[in-house]
């Protein structure tokens, strides 16, 4: 077999491969013999059909299948011989398929980029530290109470944070518009669910009262037909209900699976959850900084095949997340290309760090991570056992642990600054923290 390779771009390779005719004929004859053993032809006993008849009936198909098998096998042999690492399936261009002659074809494909990860010592990391103070715990208890707010009918005028049951009809230029009317809608004043001025205009209203609100849709309103237009809403208040926060009692604690331990037991469990969230938030922020630093220090070209595959995965995820009667390939690829490129490049960089430093998942850390996740459930032992009985889930945890070990490897050489902050700042999402 003859093989020559041409580098057409930084990542694209063009393999010209010639396979001796004898190998093709051997593969064709093998196919024909397999067919002869199974062929059922009237007038002949199974396995006794003359080869001339087999060739007449099945020769063309046998040759086509044999050529396909030889191309697949010879391509694999060629990339091994040339020490190439394909990043996707090849495009095959046949040059000569004539029977009795050598098979000639060209395979065009991309390879994985070859590089060494560098620049660890130039990465600056701010590592936060924080504790869950008693005041943080008190704030969390209030949040939990508000999340379980109940509303009771109030015989008074509406205030902010009250829940109103309303009917309304909206009109633009004297005409009702699609989506502008509803009956029996529950609306909490101050929730900002409606356009500016709508909720404010109902403060002070009582059950049975009708109010007319003259408002204007925001210029950036999502419905362009309504953006910036004046509108009139006629609103009827059916009822006014005031919020009632639940008491911190056994009934409330039971909603969270905590029984017979009282307020102190409840505070202990909530604190544990907050501390777990704090550890995860700090770890996540450090990881994001490390990954950003690796990206900046290691610009690499991405194989188009990998990028295309990742875009397709993100399309499928988007459809699964948001639903709707739409097929993944109907979503524009441009929406996902930036995210896809980041994920592909990081995947290549992380894999190279693992290779360079010969990293393997630390099984002690794997168990610790599983136990940490399991501690959020009422039966943690069962959760741990479930992970160790499911190879797919267990391997996913191993992958996460391996990424953490990559982060640790970078941190050993990066410029790390420790900073003590409040619990609230530590758990705040990175985007929100940057905006402050």
Swiss-Prot record:
Gene3D superfamilies: 3.10.50.40, Trigger factor ribosome-binding domain, Trigger factor, C-terminal domain. Residues 161-246 form the PPIase FKBP-type domain. The keyword Cytoplasm applies. It comes from the Bacteria. It is an enzyme of class 5 (isomerase). InterPro entries: PPIase_dom_sf, PPIase_FKBP_dom, Trig_fac, Trigger_fac_C, Trigger_fac_C_sf, Trigger_fac_ribosome-bd_bac, Trigger_fac_ribosome-bd_sf, Trigger_fact/SurA_dom_sf. One of its GO terms (molecular function) is ribosome binding. Consists of 3 domains; the N-terminus binds the ribosome, the middle domain has PPIase activity, while the C-terminus has intrinsic chaperone activity on its own. Involved in protein export. Acts as a chaperone by maintaining the newly synthesized protein in an open conformation. Functions as a peptidyl-prolyl cis-trans isomerase. This is Trigger factor.
């Amino acid at each position: 077999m003859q093989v020559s390779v041409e580098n057409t771009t930084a990542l694209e390779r063009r393999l010209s491969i010639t396979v001796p005719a004898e190998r093709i004929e051997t593969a064709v004859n093998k196919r024909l013999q397999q067919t002869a053993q199974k062929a059922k032809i009237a007038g002949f006993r199974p396995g006794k059909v003359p080869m001339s008849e087999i060739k007449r009936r099945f020769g063309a198909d046998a040759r086509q299948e044999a050529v396909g098998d030889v191309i697949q096998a010879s391509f694999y042999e060629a990339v091994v011989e040339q020490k190439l690492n394909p990043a996707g399936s090849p495009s095959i261009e046949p040059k000569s398929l004539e029977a009795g002659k050598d098979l000639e074809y060209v395979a065009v494909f991309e390879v994985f980029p070859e590089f060494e990860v560098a620049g660890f010592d130039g990465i600056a990391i701010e590592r936060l530290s924080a504790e869950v103070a008693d005041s943080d715990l008190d704030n969390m208890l209030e949040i939990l109470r508000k999340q379980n707010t109940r509303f009771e009918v109030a015989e008074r005028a509406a205030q902010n944070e009250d829940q109103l049951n309303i009917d309304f009809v909206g009109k633009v230029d004297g005409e009702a518009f699609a989506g502008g009317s509803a009956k029996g809608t529950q609306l909490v004043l101050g929730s900002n669910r409606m356009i500016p001025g709508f909720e404010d205009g109902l403060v002070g209203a009582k059950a049975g009262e009708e109010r007319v609100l003259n408002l204007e849709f925001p210029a950036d309103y999502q419905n362009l037909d309504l953006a910036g237009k004046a509108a009139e809403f006629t609103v009827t208040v059916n009822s006014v209900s005031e919020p009632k926060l639940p008491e911190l009692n056994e009934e409330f604690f039971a909603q969270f699976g905590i029984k017979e331990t009282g307020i102190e037991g409840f505070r202990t469990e909530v604190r544990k959850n907050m501390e777990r969230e704090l550890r995860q938030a700090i770890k996540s922020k450090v990881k994001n900084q490390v990954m950003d630093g690796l990206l900046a220090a290691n610009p690499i070209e991405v194989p188009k095949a990998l990028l295309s595959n990742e875009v397709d995965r993100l399309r499928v995820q988007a459809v699964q997340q948001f639903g709707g009667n739409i097929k993944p390939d109907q979503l524009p690829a441009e929406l996902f290309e930036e995210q896809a490129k980041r994920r592909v490049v990081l995947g290549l960089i992380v894999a190279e760090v693992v290779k360079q430093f010969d990293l393997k998942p630390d099984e002690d850390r794997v168990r610790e991570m599983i136990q940490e996740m399991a501690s959020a459930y009422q039966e943690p032992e069962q959760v741990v056992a479930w992970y160790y009985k499911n190879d797919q889930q267990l391997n996913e945890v191993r992958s996460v642990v391996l990424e953490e070990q990559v982060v640790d490897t970078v941190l050993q050489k990066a410029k790390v600054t420790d900073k003590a902050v409040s619990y609230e700042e530590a758990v705040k999402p990175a985007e929100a923290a940057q905006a402050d």
